[in-house]
Amino acid sequence: MKSQIKLFIELTRLNKPIGIMLLFWPCSWGLAYAYNYTKNLSQFLFYFLLFFFGSVLMRSAGCIINDIVDKDYDKKVKRTKQRPIAANLVSVTQALIYSALLCLVAFFILIQFNKLTIILGLSSMLLAFSYPFMKRITYWPQLFLGVTFN
Protein backbone atom coordinates (compact mmCIF):
# COMPACT_ATOMS: atom_id res chain seq x y z
CA MET A 1 0.00 0.00 0.00
CA LYS A 2 1.43 3.35 -1.03
CA SER A 3 1.50 6.21 1.45
CA GLN A 4 -0.96 9.07 0.95
CA ILE A 5 1.93 11.46 0.36
CA LYS A 6 3.38 9.31 -2.41
CA LEU A 7 -0.07 8.97 -3.99
CA PHE A 8 -0.53 12.74 -3.83
CA ILE A 9 2.86 13.27 -5.48
CA GLU A 10 1.93 10.85 -8.28
CA LEU A 11 -1.56 12.34 -8.64
CA THR A 12 -0.20 15.88 -8.98
CA ARG A 13 2.82 14.74 -11.06
CA LEU A 14 5.22 16.51 -8.72
CA ASN A 15 7.58 13.65 -9.56
CA LYS A 16 7.52 14.85 -13.20
CA PRO A 17 8.23 18.60 -12.97
CA ILE A 18 8.56 19.35 -16.70
CA GLY A 19 4.91 20.46 -16.84
CA ILE A 20 5.52 22.92 -14.03
CA MET A 21 8.49 24.37 -15.88
CA LEU A 22 6.51 24.67 -19.12
CA LEU A 23 4.00 26.80 -17.24
CA PHE A 24 6.46 28.68 -15.05
CA TRP A 25 9.15 29.72 -17.54
CA PRO A 26 6.90 31.90 -19.75
CA CYS A 27 5.69 33.64 -16.58
CA SER A 28 9.20 34.25 -15.32
CA TRP A 29 10.41 35.49 -18.71
CA GLY A 30 7.48 37.90 -18.90
CA LEU A 31 8.26 39.15 -15.42
CA ALA A 32 11.95 39.54 -16.26
CA TYR A 33 11.14 41.60 -19.36
CA ALA A 34 8.51 43.77 -17.67
CA TYR A 35 10.20 44.47 -14.36
CA ASN A 36 11.70 47.89 -13.68
CA TYR A 37 15.10 46.94 -12.30
CA THR A 38 15.70 50.40 -10.87
CA LYS A 39 13.23 49.44 -8.15
CA ASN A 40 13.81 47.17 -5.19
CA LEU A 41 14.60 43.59 -6.24
CA SER A 42 12.57 42.19 -3.36
CA GLN A 43 9.40 43.02 -5.32
CA PHE A 44 10.76 41.08 -8.31
CA LEU A 45 11.55 38.09 -6.09
CA PHE A 46 8.09 38.30 -4.50
CA TYR A 47 6.36 38.05 -7.89
CA PHE A 48 8.85 35.44 -9.09
CA LEU A 49 7.89 33.22 -6.15
CA LEU A 50 4.18 33.88 -6.68
CA PHE A 51 4.52 32.77 -10.30
CA PHE A 52 6.48 29.69 -9.27
CA PHE A 53 4.07 28.52 -6.58
CA GLY A 54 1.08 29.43 -8.73
CA SER A 55 2.52 27.30 -11.53
CA VAL A 56 3.08 24.35 -9.21
CA LEU A 57 -0.42 24.59 -7.76
CA MET A 58 -2.29 25.05 -11.03
CA ARG A 59 -0.35 22.42 -12.95
CA SER A 60 -0.99 20.00 -10.08
CA ALA A 61 -4.71 20.81 -9.99
CA GLY A 62 -4.86 20.42 -13.77
CA CYS A 63 -3.28 16.97 -13.58
CA ILE A 64 -5.87 15.90 -11.04
CA ILE A 65 -8.76 17.19 -13.16
CA ASN A 66 -7.27 15.45 -16.20
CA ASP A 67 -7.07 12.16 -14.31
CA ILE A 68 -10.65 12.47 -13.06
CA VAL A 69 -11.99 13.12 -16.55
CA ASP A 70 -9.83 10.40 -18.14
CA LYS A 71 -10.09 7.73 -15.42
CA ASP A 72 -11.99 5.25 -17.59
CA TYR A 73 -9.58 5.74 -20.51
CA ASP A 74 -6.52 5.62 -18.25
CA LYS A 75 -7.54 2.18 -16.97
CA LYS A 76 -7.21 0.81 -20.52
CA VAL A 77 -3.84 2.35 -21.42
CA LYS A 78 -0.63 0.65 -20.29
CA ARG A 79 1.17 3.99 -19.68
CA THR A 80 -1.63 5.42 -17.51
CA LYS A 81 -3.38 2.49 -15.86
CA GLN A 82 -1.26 2.83 -12.70
CA ARG A 83 -2.25 6.45 -12.09
CA PRO A 84 -3.79 6.75 -8.62
CA ILE A 85 -7.39 7.38 -9.73
CA ALA A 86 -7.34 4.81 -12.55
CA ALA A 87 -5.89 2.22 -10.15
CA ASN A 88 -8.58 3.06 -7.55
CA LEU A 89 -5.94 4.11 -5.02
CA VAL A 90 -7.47 7.59 -4.74
CA SER A 91 -11.22 8.15 -5.02
CA VAL A 92 -12.72 10.76 -7.31
CA THR A 93 -14.07 12.51 -4.21
CA GLN A 94 -10.61 12.68 -2.64
CA ALA A 95 -9.16 13.91 -5.92
CA LEU A 96 -11.80 16.64 -6.21
CA ILE A 97 -11.04 17.77 -2.66
CA TYR A 98 -7.29 17.84 -3.38
CA SER A 99 -7.86 19.79 -6.59
CA ALA A 100 -10.22 22.26 -4.90
CA LEU A 101 -7.69 22.90 -2.13
CA LEU A 102 -4.91 23.48 -4.65
CA CYS A 103 -7.13 25.89 -6.60
CA LEU A 104 -8.08 27.72 -3.41
CA VAL A 105 -4.45 28.28 -2.44
CA ALA A 106 -3.68 29.30 -6.04
CA PHE A 107 -6.56 31.79 -5.90
CA PHE A 108 -5.02 33.42 -2.83
CA ILE A 109 -1.81 33.77 -4.81
CA LEU A 110 -3.69 35.15 -7.82
CA ILE A 111 -5.38 37.93 -5.84
CA GLN A 112 -1.95 39.37 -5.03
CA PHE A 113 -1.86 40.65 -8.61
CA ASN A 114 -3.74 43.50 -10.33
CA LYS A 115 -7.32 43.26 -11.60
CA LEU A 116 -6.39 42.49 -15.22
CA THR A 117 -4.09 39.66 -14.15
CA ILE A 118 -6.82 38.21 -11.94
CA ILE A 119 -9.32 38.27 -14.81
CA LEU A 120 -6.82 36.70 -17.22
CA GLY A 121 -5.82 34.09 -14.63
CA LEU A 122 -9.41 33.07 -13.93
CA SER A 123 -10.30 32.93 -17.63
CA SER A 124 -7.26 30.78 -18.40
CA MET A 125 -8.48 28.21 -15.87
CA LEU A 126 -11.46 27.51 -18.11
CA LEU A 127 -9.12 26.79 -21.01
CA ALA A 128 -6.75 24.66 -18.93
CA PHE A 129 -9.52 22.56 -17.40
CA SER A 130 -11.10 21.97 -20.81
CA TYR A 131 -7.92 20.25 -22.06
CA PRO A 132 -9.00 16.69 -21.13
CA PHE A 133 -12.15 17.11 -23.18
CA MET A 134 -10.18 18.22 -26.24
CA LYS A 135 -8.77 14.69 -26.47
CA ARG A 136 -12.25 13.58 -27.46
CA ILE A 137 -12.64 16.00 -30.37
CA THR A 138 -9.13 16.43 -31.83
CA TYR A 139 -5.96 14.44 -32.40
CA TRP A 140 -3.94 17.49 -31.30
CA PRO A 141 -5.02 18.27 -27.74
CA GLN A 142 -1.45 19.26 -26.82
CA LEU A 143 -1.69 22.15 -29.29
CA PHE A 144 -4.71 23.42 -27.38
CA LEU A 145 -2.84 23.00 -24.09
CA GLY A 146 0.21 24.82 -25.45
CA VAL A 147 -1.90 27.77 -26.55
CA THR A 148 -3.56 27.76 -23.14
CA PHE A 149 -0.22 27.83 -21.30
CA ASN A 150 1.06 30.75 -23.32
Please annotate each region the language model reported.
Residues 9-10, 83-150:
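Intramembrane alpha-helical segments
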Residues 34, 38, 71-74, 135-139:
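Perimembrane helix-loop junctions in membrane proteins
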Residues 1-6, 63-90:
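Cytosolic, membrane-interface loops and tails of multi-pass inner-membrane proteins
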Residues 13-23:
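Membrane-interface helix starts
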Residues 21-33, 84, 144-150:
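Small-residue-rich segments of transmembrane alpha-helices in multi-pass membrane proteins
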Residues 20, 64, 72-75, 79, ...:
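Hydrophobic positions within alpha-helical membrane elements
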Residues 27-28, 32-69, 79, 103-107, ...:
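Membrane-embedded alpha-helical segments that form the functional core of polytopic membrane enzymes
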Residues 2, 6, 14, 38-46, ...:
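Juxtamembrane/transmembrane-helix boundary motifs in multi-pass membrane proteins
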